[in-house]
């Protein structure tokens, strides 16, 4: 839910009374709600200065929960995105129905990773950043986990190194039965 704080807190309490789990997000504004209306003119002005291209990877629209079409390459689509409800559950369900089993969250926290896990718990959910953690290490750990779950990143473009800047130490995932951490030290 997004909107007026008093109303959303009341609705969250009512939902929890009926057994529906809720999580309050730490955000500065009521994003994806009519509360974004005051910035829409400025947003659209800036959005019209950008050049849009058809995506080369299929995208599921958060506004419909279905595969996005040409509308995703318009400023109006993105203005609607910041003002209207995000259909997160439907989006993850559609991705699940398209056999998506790995989610890599590109963002400042792991909030969406945790939310996706509640919708599709059998998939792999990988955040690329975590609050109050060393960002390069967190990103490298996420990419290592991505590799270990079946997708190999192009490492040399992600972690370039020279004799003066050797590759960083990579924390390797704990083997499931050993319970000990391993560290790979680059040469």
Model-derived features with residue positions:
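Acyltransferase
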Residues: 1-106, 110-112, 161
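Flexible, low-complexity segments
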Residues: 67, 73, 77-187
């Amino acid at each position: 839910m997004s909107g007026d704080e008093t109303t959303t807190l009341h609705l969250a309490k009512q939902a929890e009374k009926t057994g529906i789990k809720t999580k309050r997000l730490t955000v500065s504004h009521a994003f994806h709600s009519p509360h974004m209306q005051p910035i829409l003119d400025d947003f659209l002005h800036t959005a019209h200065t950008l050049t849009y291209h058809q995506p080369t990877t299929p995208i599921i629209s958060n506004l419909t929960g279905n595969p996005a079409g040409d509308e995703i390459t318009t400023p109006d689509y993105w203005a609607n995105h910041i003002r209207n409800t995000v259909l997160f559950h439907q989006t993850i369900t559609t991705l699940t129905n398209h056999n998506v089993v790995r989610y890599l969250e590109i963002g400042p926290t792991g909030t969406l990773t945790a939310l996706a896990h509640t919708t599709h718990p059998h998939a792999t959910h990988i955040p690329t950043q975590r609050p109050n953690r060393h960002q390069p290490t967190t990103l490298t750990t996420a990419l290592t986990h991505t590799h270990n779950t079946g997708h190999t990143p192009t490492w040399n473009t992600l972690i370039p190194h020279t004799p003066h800047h050797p590759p960083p130490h990579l924390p390797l995932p704990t083997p499931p039965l050993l319970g000990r951490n391993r560290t790979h030290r680059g040469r």
